């Protein structure tokens, strides 16, 4: 039998002591209720006011500290707007730093998109009117300030932006916001003893050991029996999540980033890279409770161990516990959900050009070059399709502004038509081929950017300039 070191003995003793004093149900029973962000539903030209400001909030659950957010709250409200309408935006910056904001996934021209070229100094405002001309999608808004987007997003400048269309509104889907249609914003953080966020600038990676969902660690939500719709956003700076249900139950994947899939897909797990979004349905008809978790299910011993000695691991890997209430729903069968989407049609269309991008994750380079705002890296023609081949030295997220793509293949896996959805962000673990469609114009003054979705690497310059004309 191998001998334990003194350090291992002390660690084991500490865990054993903790286990002896913590009742088994305590970890679940002491959860806080999920906070659902306020909803701004845009109707009849209602303006969307987003005021960036400091506020107070107990991020660690016990210490009230200064954080950033919108309209007096930590994080931003969920914006819901219908395709075919106009977004009358009113951005106000009441923060001590200059801020640029982008709505990732929004299909709009470079001039209206926002992004790094639209910097608001302290006290400044910007009020664009943006036509919404894309199908149902889950977008998100965040800081896009050059060399400072990670810090500002981490402080709380993030929120969900949902686009609905006729199909999504008429589909047989849960649609009661905060009841059976739940937005979940995932962030990993690290705190000091006073509950303040810890952050190291100019680092290629950041992973915190505390997982917050809508600003709450390991929350629960009471839901009616039936199907529950979870709209997931990975707003972490660098961490990807391997999501699954802790009872090994299947989930229905219905949408990714910018569109529905042609048909709902049963999945046991789902990888969500930084900046990526997905929609899943969870069947709560025949179970009393289930937890969405990241990684594998942990025993009580493992939970206590990670709370005491987590390192880069999450102290608690619970995203959300769902607790079913009431009687069995009459609609407990798995819905046969199919959706109209033109994403698969791109496979049959002509490719104007093929480009290859090699991402050096360690040094923050794309094709051995660092971001230069004065240099155009890609010039594309509006209305064309290009094949981009993505390689990365280490697994990393990749994202693009103002355009959309489908994933053609990942490694040896060639995606089938029924697996395709429009996307703007993808996890590059091995060679990944995407077909990119350019429908929006950008200029030298207001270009689009592409590059890693790891905001730490983005701030180091792992980006490129995209002009579409």
Curated annotation (Swiss-Prot):
Primary location recorded for the protein, binned into one broad class: periplasm
Recorded GO MF terms: copper ion binding; oxidoreductase activity
Superkingdom of the organism of origin: Bacteria
Entry comment on modification after translation: Predicted to be exported by the Tat system. The position of the signal peptide cleavage has not been experimentally proven.
Occurrences of domain Plastocyanin-like (ranges): 228-286
Subcellular location: Periplasm
Signal peptide: 1-29
CDD domains: CuRO_1_CueO_FtsP, CuRO_2_CueO_FtsP, CuRO_3_CueO_FtsP
GO CC entries: cell division site; outer membrane-bounded periplasmic space
GO biological process terms, semicolon-separated: FtsZ-dependent cytokinesis
Keywords associated with the record: Cell cycle, Cell division, Periplasm, Signal
Matches recorded under InterPro entries: Cu-oxidase-like_N, Cu-oxidase_2nd, Cu-oxidase_C, Cu-oxidase_fam, Cupredoxin, FtsP, TAT_signal
Gene3D superfamilies (alphabetical): Cupredoxins - blue copper proteins
Entry annotated with the keyword Cell division: yes
Family label: Belongs to the FtsP family.
Biological role: Cell division protein that is required for growth during stress conditions. May be involved in protecting or stabilizing the divisomal assembly under conditions of stress.
HAMAP family, alphabetized: FtsP
PANTHER family: BILIRUBIN OXIDASE, CUPREDOXIN SUPERFAMILY PROTEIN
This protein's name: Cell division protein FtsP
Source organism of this protein record: Haemophilus influenzae (strain 86-028NP)
């Amino acid at each position: 039998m191998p001998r334990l070191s003194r350090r291992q003995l002390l660690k084991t003793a500490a865990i054993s002591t903790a286990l002896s004093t913590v009742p088994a149900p305590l970890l679940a029973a002491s959860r806080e209720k999920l906070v659902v962000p306020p909803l701004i539903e845009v109707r009849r030209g209602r303006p969307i006011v987003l005021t960036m400001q400091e506020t107070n909030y107990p991020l660690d659950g016990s210490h009230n500290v200064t954080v950033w957010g919108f309209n007096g709250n930590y994080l931003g409200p969920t914006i819901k707007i219908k395709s075919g309408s106009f977004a009358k935006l009113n951005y106000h910056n009441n923060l001590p730093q200059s801020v640029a904001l982008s709505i990732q996934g929004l299909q709009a021209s470079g001039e209206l998109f926002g992004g790094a070229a639209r910097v608001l100094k302290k006290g400044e405002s910007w009020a664009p009117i943006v036509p919404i001309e894309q199908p149902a999608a889950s977008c998100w808004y965040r800081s896009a300030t050059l060399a400072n987007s990670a810090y500002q997003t981490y402080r709380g400048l993030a929120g969900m932006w949902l686009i609905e269309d006729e199909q999504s509104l008429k589909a047989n889907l849960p649609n009661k916001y905060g009841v059976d249609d739940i937005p979940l914003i995932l962030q990993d953080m690290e705190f000091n003893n006073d509950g303040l966020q810890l952050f190291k600038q100019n680092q290629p990676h950041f992973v915190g050991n505390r997982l917050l969902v809508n600003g709450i660690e390991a929350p629960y939500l009471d839901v009616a029996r039936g199907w529950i719709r979870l709209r997931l956003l990975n707003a972490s700076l660098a961490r990807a999540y391997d999501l699954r249900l802790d009872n090994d139950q299947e989930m229905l994947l219905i949408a990714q980033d910018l569109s529905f899939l042609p048909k709902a897909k049963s999945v046991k797990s789902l990888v969500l890279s930084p900046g990526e979004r997905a929609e899943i349905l969870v069947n709560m008809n025949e179970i009393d409770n289930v937890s969405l978790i990241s990684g594998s299910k942990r025993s009580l011993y493992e939970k206590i161990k990670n709370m005491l000695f987590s390192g880069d691991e999450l102290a608690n890997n619970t995203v959300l516990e769902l607790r079913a209430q009431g009687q069995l729903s009459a609609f407990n069968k798995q819905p046969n959900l199919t959706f109209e989407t033109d994403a698969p049609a791109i496979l049959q269309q002509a490719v104007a050009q093929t480009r290859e991008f090699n991402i050096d994750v360690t040094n923050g380079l794309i094709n051995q070059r660092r971001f230069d705002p004065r240099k155009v890296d890609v010039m594309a023609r509006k209305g064309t399709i290009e094949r981009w081949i993505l390689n990365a030295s280490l697994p990393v997220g990749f994202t693009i502004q103002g355009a959309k793509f489908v994933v053609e293949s990942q490694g040896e896996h060639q995606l089938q038509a029924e697996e395709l959805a429009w996307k703007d962000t993808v996890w590059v673990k091995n060679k990944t081929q995407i077909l990119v469609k350019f429908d929006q114009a950008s200029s030298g003054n207001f270009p689009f950017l592409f590059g890693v979705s790891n905001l730490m690497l983005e701030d180091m310059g792992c980006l490129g300039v995209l002009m579409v004309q």
